[in-house]
């Protein structure tokens, strides 16, 4: 059995579910935003078979002991039904406890393959950390400054020349696109002090690479545009791009060091053809590329999951009293709950 933890009506999860089920495999979606308001979770400490169950989007109750692969796609959404909660504190309690219970139960009772492990996913989502890992693996990375100081930003732009600015993490809601920053000395110092931002040297060129990594398999698209951020306008030349062996090896090294089984990577090619690392999204979007490139990424990803399931079925499933996974906090993601 393959499980996907995601949000209600997530197009990626639904498309992959359809592809996997066509292969005669069992695939269920557990809606991380649909725990509140129904009997969605159950766990007992005695470890008997069936002592850990989750309710799927179809309303079925499945035992985690039967699952072999867990696609950790969108695990930490707020609840769509707050189960009668009215105040902000009550809603926070519902969201935290639903999130914590789901993550904790999975960490304690799921013994198959994570796509990708929760702690690795969290760590790899740190853009500063992943830049350091990519650099150590031999990638060229943009010269980068994370700062709240106008003076530091001014000095940095004078050192590197053309500079872009983007969020360190970002927020839910409208996207904040990458932008040029010119003459930072003309902005008030207080505008820099509100929160840290990421400042990077501008990489010359118009060839962007979107690299979809599913296990050892990689499928790339070449996006040609002069825009800093290609995402707002996809009405540009986009086509499949063959991944060179050297790049494949470097990317594999980065993903292994990050502990990721999959990743969606953004690169930019210099005018000389050198790939420059921009970032990896541990659970990035890929469906939009199918109609633009003709690459059947849904089928490729379904093959990746079913191969992982077959590999797990060939191994002995650990007993219930085997060593529990480390760092449950990385999985539960609870905040401000106390002890």
Residue ranges and their predicted role:
Residues 1-3:
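Extreme N-terminal starter segment of soluble prokaryotic enzymes
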Residues 7-22, 28-140:
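Conserved N-proximal alpha/beta basic substrate-recognition cap immediately N-terminal to
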Residues 20, 158-250:
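Phosphate-binding site of ATP-dependent enzymes
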Residues 45-48, 57-58, 213-217, 271-273:
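Short acidic-glycine loop/turn motifs at beta-strand connectors
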Residues 123-176:
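Loop-centered beta-sheet repeat module
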Residues 193-196, 201, 229-275, 298-310, ...:
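A long amphipathic alpha-helix within ATP-dependent nucleotide-binding catalytic cores
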Residues 211-213, 273-288:
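A short beta-strand motif that forms the metal-chelation/ATP-contact edge
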């Amino acid at each position: 059995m393959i499980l996907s933890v995601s949000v209600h009506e997530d197009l990626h999860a639904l498309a992959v579910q359809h592809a996997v089920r066509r292969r005669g495999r069992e695939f269920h979606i557990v809606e991380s935003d649909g725990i509140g308001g129904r009997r969605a979770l159950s766990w007992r400490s005695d470890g008997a078979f069936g002592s850990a169950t989750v309710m799927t989007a179809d309303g079925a109750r499945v035992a985690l002991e039967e699952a072999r692969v867990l696609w950790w796609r969108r695990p930490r959404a707020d609840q769509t039904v707050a189960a009668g909660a009215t105040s902000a504190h009550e809603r926070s309690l519902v969201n935290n406890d639903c999130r914590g219970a789901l993550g904790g139960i999975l960490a304690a009772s799921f013994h198959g393959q994570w796509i990708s492990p929760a702690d690795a996913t969290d760590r790899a989502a740190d853009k500063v950390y992943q830049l350091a890992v990519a650099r150590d693996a031999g990638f060229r990375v943009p010269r980068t400054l994370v700062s709240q100081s106008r003076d530091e930003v001014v000095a940095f732009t004078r050192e590197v020349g053309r500079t872009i600015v983007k969020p360190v993490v970002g927020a839910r809601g409208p996207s904040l696109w990458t932008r040029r920053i010119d003459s930072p000395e003309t902005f008030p110092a207080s505008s820099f002090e509100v929160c840290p931002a990421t400042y990077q040297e501008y990489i010359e060129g118009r060839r962007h690479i979107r690299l979809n990594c599913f296990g050892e398999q990689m499928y790339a698209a070449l996006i040609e545009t002069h825009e800093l951020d290609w995402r707002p306008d996809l009405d540009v030349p986009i086509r499949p791009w063959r991944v060179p062996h050297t790049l494949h090896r470097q990317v594999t090294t980065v993903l292994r060091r990050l502990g990721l089984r999959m990743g969606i990577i953004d690169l930019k090619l210099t005018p000389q053809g050198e790939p420059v690392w921009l970032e990896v999204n541990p659970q990035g979007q890929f469906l939009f590329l199918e109609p633009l490139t003709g690459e059947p990424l849904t089928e490729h990803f379904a093959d990746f999951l079913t191969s992982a399931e077959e590999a797990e079925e060939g191994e002995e499933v650990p007993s219930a009293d085997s060593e529990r996974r480390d760092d449950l906090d990385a999985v539960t993601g609870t905040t401000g709950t106390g002890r």
